[in-house]
Regions:
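N-terminal Rossmann-like FAD-binding beta1-loop-alpha1 element of flavoenzymes
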Residues: 5-31
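Conserved Rossmann-like nucleotide-cofactor binding loop
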Residues: 15, 38, 199
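Flavin-dependent oxidoreductases
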Residues: 18, 49, 171-234
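Glycine-rich FAD pyrophosphate-binding loop
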Residues: 24-44
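Conserved dinucleotide-binding and phosphotransfer motif residues
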Residues: 26-28, 107, 158
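Short loop/edge segments at beta-strand edges and connector loops
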Residues: 34, 81, 115-116, 164-166, ...
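Dinucleotide-binding Rossmann-like beta1-alpha1 core, especially the glycine-rich loop
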Residues: 47-122
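Helical element adjacent to the flavin cofactor pocket in flavoenzyme catalytic cores
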Residues: 134-191
Length: 234
C-alpha cells in the first residue's frame, strides 16, 4: 500500500534528519529514507571538526547557527568546545590569513589574531616555524559516529517516520507531488527533499537534473593510543 506524506527526504544524514525534525515540529508529516543506516554515510565517518575559521564568509550566518545547534546537542554527540587556531607558515599564507579572517570576523565570527607568545603558551608542541595565527574560542569538535544514534532517538521521540536500508529505485512526478519506488515499498509525497550528499547526483538524475557534483574523499589516520600533543583544534 502506498503511504502519503507531506514531505519525503532522501538521505538520512545530518541535513536530512535535522530538516525532518524541524518540519515535524511545524506539523508536517515527513518520512526519511536512507540506503544505509541513519548518520552512517559522510555524516558519520568524518573527523568531526567544528571550526568557524574554515567557513566561507557568505555562509557565516548559517555556520554560526549550526554551531549553536551542535552545542545544544552537547554530550549526546560528544560536543567539546576547545578553541581553535589557524596557522600560517609563510609570508604569503600570513597575508591570506589576515585578509580572510578579518572578513570572517566582520561577518560575525569571534576570530582574533594572536601573538606567537600567546600561541606558544596555549600549544607548546606547535612548530616554531609558524609566522601568524588566528584564534576562535568557539571552535571545537563532535564525535561524528554518535550522530546517527542521536537522530534515531530524536526522530522516534518526535514520531517522525524513517526507513533504513531503503534504496530509492525510481522517482516520478505526478499531479499531486512525487512517487518514490523504493526497496521498502512505494512512497507518495507532496514535496521532495534530496539530501543524499555524495550520492545526490544519481538520485537527482531521476528527475532529469544533472548536478555538477564531484566527490572528494578526505582521510583520517588512526595511530596507537598516545598522550595528547595539542588541546585545541588546529
Amino acid at each position: 500500500m502506498t503511504k502519503t506524506y507531506d514531505l519525503a527526504i532522501v538521505g538520512g544524514g545530518i541535513m536530512g534528519c535535522s530538516t525532518a525534525l524541524r518540519l515535524a515540529e511545524d506539523g508536517m508529516k515527513t518520512i526519511v529514507l536512507d540506503q544505509g543506516d541513519l548518520g552512517q554515510g559522510a555524516s558519520g565517518v568524518n573527523a568531526g571538526t567544528l571550526s568557524l575559521q574554515i567557513k566561507r564568509v557568505k555562509l557565516m550566518p548559517y555556520a554560526l547557527k549550526g554551531h549553536s545547534e551542535w552545542e545544544a546537542m552537547g554530550e549526546a554527540v560528544g560536543f567539546k568546545k576547545t578553541g581553535g587556531f589557524t596557522l600560517a607558515f609563510t609570508e604569503h599564507e600570513a597575508e591570506l590569513l589576515y585578509e580572510r579572517q578579518a572578513l570572517q570576523a566582520d561577518a560575525g565570527a569571534p576570530i582574533t589574531f594572536v601573538s606567537n607568545n600567546a600561541l606558544r603558551a596555549a600549544e607548546q608542541n606547535l612548530s616554531h616555524k609558524v609566522l601568524a595565527a588566528s584564534y576562535c574560542p568557539e571552535d571545537g569538535y563532535a564525535n561524528s559516529s554518535l550522530t546517527g544514534q542521536y537522530y534515531r532517538i530524536r526522530l522516534k521521540e518526535n514520531e517522525v517516520q524513517f526507513r533504513e536500508k531503503c534504496n530509492v529505485k525510481l522517482i516520478t512526478r505526478n499531479s499531486s507531488g512525487f512517487n518514490l519506488t523504493t526497496s521498502c515499498g512505494t512512497v507518495h509525497a507532496t514535496r521532495l527533499l534530496l539530501a543524499a550528499g555524495a550520492w545526490l547526483k544519481p538520485i537527482a538524475a531521476h528527475l532529469a537534473v544533472d548536478l555538477p557534483i564531484r566527490t572528494r574523499v578526505n582521510t583520517v589516520s588512526v595511530t596507537e593510543r598516545m598522550s595528547p600533543l595539542i588541546s585545541s583544534i588546529v
